[in-house]
């Protein structure tokens, strides 16, 4: 269930986040996420699902013995979250001026994103979900040649560390993390370190070389 892929079409009741000692109010976060969604694609009168909407979707799925695997893609495909992070913190959180990818070497960008993800991880874990897909594909490929640029700029290790940190958040909540394959040991490159063995790799492409 791709609730966060470029846009973020599901808002929790409490969207407040604390980053670097500063708390951003729930309504302010919702407003900035909504603005980011509209900038990506204006869906009209209903741009986001509410928490009660999602509660109902999950309850119906469970009644039919259907398992929900939520997806919030990170650190790429994050147009709405990136827009909100930059607007709220006043820090440019973008990688390579991408409109969709946070800079994994920027501590504010990482802290904001992980704080927001934690709320969704907690929500879906509380609903009994066994897996959480963090995406982790197509890094800033709207502005660069993606993971090749990270390796060239010696930031691939930052990506590995970021993915492992998010995976650890998911595992700590009792779920299994999923990531798409193209950024995992990109082009057989191991210079960034070792990815967590807790991650289930989902193959959607033969990879970009």
What annotation goes with each model-predicted range?
Residues 1-147:
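Feature activates predominantly on carbohydrate-active enzymes
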Residues 126-127, 139-142, 148-209:
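Catalytic-core regions of glycoside hydrolase
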